[in-house]
Structure formats: C-alpha cells, structure tokens
C-alpha cells in the first residue's frame, strides 16, 4: 500500500512535539462573563479534592491519553503501565479507579483545572508547561491557564517518576494530601514489578489450562474430541469446521476448563460480557457444546459487521481478527487502509495497518476512533489460525474456494489470496500435526 504519512516527531504519548508548548487557549475572544467563574468555584477547583474526599467518594479519577504505555482497552480491561500503576495506587487508598481519556496534554490540564479529574497519570515533562518554579516548593509549577484568562493553575508534580525527575505525574497544586500520599507510596521498583506483571498478563502463560490435547488420530484425520461440535456449528459460524477447530486450538488448546486472567472462559475463551450478550449463562460457560455454539453465533455476528467485505473468505479473516482485537479496532485499520490507498476489503492490506496501530502516528490519526491496539497480537492470531487450518487440511492454502455446504463453508485447496499475502505451499508436508 502506498504510505504517504509525513514523518513527525512525537512525544511518548502521541502528541506532536511542540503542540503543547503554548498553553494559551483559543477562547480569548469570549466575553468576560464566560471567561470568569466565581472566585469560590475557581479556588475549589484549584485545590481539588483532598485525599479524604476521594476516599469518601470511593473513586479516583485518572486523566490520561491513549497509548501503549499509558492506557488502552484490552479485551474490555484497562492496560498500560501508567494505568496499572494508578490502579495499584487506587487499591492502596481503598477506592475504585475511573479513567477519563483525553486527546492531548492540554485537555488533561484543562480537565484537572476544572475539577474533572484528580490526577494526571502521564509522565509530564516539566518544560512543556512554560512555568516557573513557585516559592511554594521545588515540585510546584505555575503555568498559564489553558482557558486563556488571567488565572493560573498550580500543578503539583508528584508520584510516579520513571526517569529520575525529568517527568512525573501531576495533580492540582493545592492538593497536598494526595500528593504526599502518592510520593510516599511510589517506589522506583514498582515500575519494574508492574512491567513484569503486564508482560505476564499479555502472555499465553496467563491462561490457566488443565489438560493437554494432542492430535487424536493422525491416520484418520481426527483433530480433537470436539470435532463433532465444530462440524455441527460451523454452518452457524459461516466457516469451515477445521477453521473453527484451528481457532479453538489458538484460544484454549482444546481445554474446556481454560480461563484467562481477564475472565475469558472455555474452549473458545468467551468473555463474561460476551456470554451475557449471547445469552450464555456463566453456569454453562465451561460446557463444551454451549461454549462452541455461543462462539459460532458470535462469529456469525462479527461476519455480519463486515457485510461490506464482499468475499466470504476475506470476511472470515476479518471476523477472526475482530474476535481477538475488537470490531472497532479492525474498522479503524480499515479506515487507515482506505486513507493511504490500500484495499480496505483485503485482509492482507488491512493487516499492515492493524500492525501500525501500535504507532502514535497512526493510532493518533484523525480517522482512528478507538486509539491504540496490540496489533501484532491480532495479526499473529489470524496468521496462526490460518497456518493451523492449512495443516488440518493436509497442506492446502487459504484461497481457491469458500463455498457453503451442510457443514458450513468449505475452503478449498490452492490459493494464497485468502488474506492477500502469499503462503508457502505445504503440499509435501507429511501430516505432522504438532499441537
């Protein structure tokens, strides 16, 4: 695909360098009445909620931006180093954590000033605020008000500092109790510990499996003890039963009792929220047939979301990607593909932009509505299922035909255009189903 994206230096959270150097707002022409709040209200905003107020409310409001190290949604769970650190701090003070996602640093400071958040949980470089150290202390910076009036807001840098003081979280200057608690709680080793925890959560090792399910009968082509279920429900899913089997292996290694840290359960690793949407009670989520049947309905639903993708084989790949990475993220990648001259109905083209949604220049693009995604994981998920399906079919590649039948669509031999990328032929492959 043609890629004409101009190169631009970005901060770690995706804001173009220099964009927030001037904190002056664009509302200078508003009337004085709109520019000024009551003095009492302004003072209350600048003080912010005290630690005891936050604890009484039972909620800490985290202001952040979307990104791989700040905050992103991963299978309906918050993820990102700064989010996980803030979550641990919220647990420490006995409250829940609510995330307010902002588009840039300026919006975070605006919301903090208005009392719409308690803490900016993004390491802010002090120099971007163009402030001078106040007499109140070395960690307090007075910055021009982002609302454009004559008021100032005191930011109190506190808590997490990943780089020896060059950057740090920030709260409202008057909120000393919250800042002192954050400073007392934070220890540099927390960053390393949380990084290890995040790495584990994102690994397959975090899925608790109870059985190992090898290929049952190579000579007779029996893939698993659940083949009859894949055959029965592949028509509902609108996919070849062996493709469904390959997806199941990727999800759970054919373990009906598998459970991930995020709560995904069963053969097809269905999330509780998805189970509720599909009418699958949690009491039945580990039942093999109920789980496969629900997953088949969900795959059919996802394929319906991609009804604009004309080729059924391509549509199946888009649905697999959405099963793993989320429908909205795949739509974002399709929008990028269209913008930069690719074919948004070809998985091979869209896959490239799924991968690029890990980069600030792309997940910050105006056509992207849902931000950062772990694109490498989703691309790998589809690649592995596709390769395993090829093994199950005796070395066929994903392409030539995808026609309906009593057991669901059948993917024929030959073919490398199923995902738009070539696949090395495995016709001489001696059925080594290494599972």
What is the meaning of each model-derived region?
Residues 205-254, 289-292, 306-310, 403:
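Export/targeting segments at the very N-terminus of extracytoplasmic proteins
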Residues 257-283, 290-301, 385:
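Substrate-binding/active-site groove segments that recognize
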Residues 1-4:
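Bacterial signal peptide processing site
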Residues 377-435:
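Low-complexity, Gly/Ser/Thr/Pro-rich intrinsically disordered linker/tail segments
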Residues 7-124, 182, 230:
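Extracytoplasmic small-molecule ligand-binding "clamshell" domains
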Residues 44-47, 52-53, 69, 79, ...:
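Acidic, polar ligand-binding/catalytic clefts
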Residues 167-171, 317-391:
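Catalytic and substrate-binding regions of cell-wall glycan-acting enzymes that process beta-1,4-linked
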Residues 38, 183-222, 338, 389, ...:
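Ligand-binding clefts/hinges and TM-proximal coupling segments of bilobed small-molecule sensing domains
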């Amino acid at each position: 695909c043609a890629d004409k994206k101009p190169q631009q230096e970005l901060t770690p959270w995706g804001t173009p360098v220099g964009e927030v150097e001037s904190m002056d707002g664009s509302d200078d022409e508003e009337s004085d009445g709109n520019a000024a709040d009551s003095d009492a209200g302004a003072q209350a905003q600048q003080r912010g909620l005290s630690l005891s107020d936050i604890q009484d409310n039972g909620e800490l409001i985290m202001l952040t931006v979307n990104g791989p190290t700040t905050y992103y949604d991963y299978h309906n769970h918050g993820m990102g180093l700064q989010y996980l650190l803030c979550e641990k701090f919220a647990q420490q003070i006995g409250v829940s954590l609510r995330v307010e996602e902002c588009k840039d640093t300026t919006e975070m400071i605006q919301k903090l000033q208005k009392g719409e958040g308690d803490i900016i949980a993004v390491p802010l470089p002090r120099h971007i605020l163009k402030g001078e150290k106040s007499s109140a202390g070395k960690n307090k910076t007075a910055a021009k008000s982002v609302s454009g009036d004559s008021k100032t807001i005191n930011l109190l840098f506190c808590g997490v500092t990943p780089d020896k003081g060059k950057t740090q979280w920030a709260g409202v200057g008057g909120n000393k109790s919250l800042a002192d608690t954050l400073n007392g709680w934070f220890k540099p080793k927390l960053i390393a510990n949380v990084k290890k925890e995040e790495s584990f959560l994102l690994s397959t090792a975090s899925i608790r499996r109870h059985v190992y399910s090898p290929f049952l009968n190579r000579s007779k082509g029996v893939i698993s003890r659940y083949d009859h279920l894949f055959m029965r429900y592949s028509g509902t899913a609108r996919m070849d039963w062996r493709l469904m089997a390959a997806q199941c292996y990727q999800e759970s290694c054919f373990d009906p009792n598998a459970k991930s840290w995020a709560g995904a359960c069963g053969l097809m690793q269905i999330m509780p929220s998805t189970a509720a949407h599909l009418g699958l009670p949690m009491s039945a989520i580990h039942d093999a047939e109920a789980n496969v049947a629900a997953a088949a309905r969900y795959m059919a639903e996802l394929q319906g979301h991609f009804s604009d993708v004309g080729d059924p084989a391509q549509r199946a790949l888009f649905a697999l990607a959405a099963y793993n990475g989320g429908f909205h993220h795949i739509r974002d990648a399709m929008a990028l593909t269209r913008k930069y001259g690719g074919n948004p109905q070809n998985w091979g083209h869209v896959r490239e932009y799924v991968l690029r949604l890990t980069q600030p220049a792309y997940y910050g693009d105006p056509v992207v509505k849902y931000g950062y995604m772990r694109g490498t994981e989703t691309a790998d998920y589809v690649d592995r299922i596709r390769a395993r399906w090829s093994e199950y079919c005796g070395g066929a590649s994903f392409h030539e035909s995808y026609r309906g039948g009593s057991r669901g669509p059948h993917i024929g031999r030959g073919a490398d255009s199923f995902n738009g990328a070539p696949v090395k032929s495995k016709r001489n492959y001696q059925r080594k189903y290494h599972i």
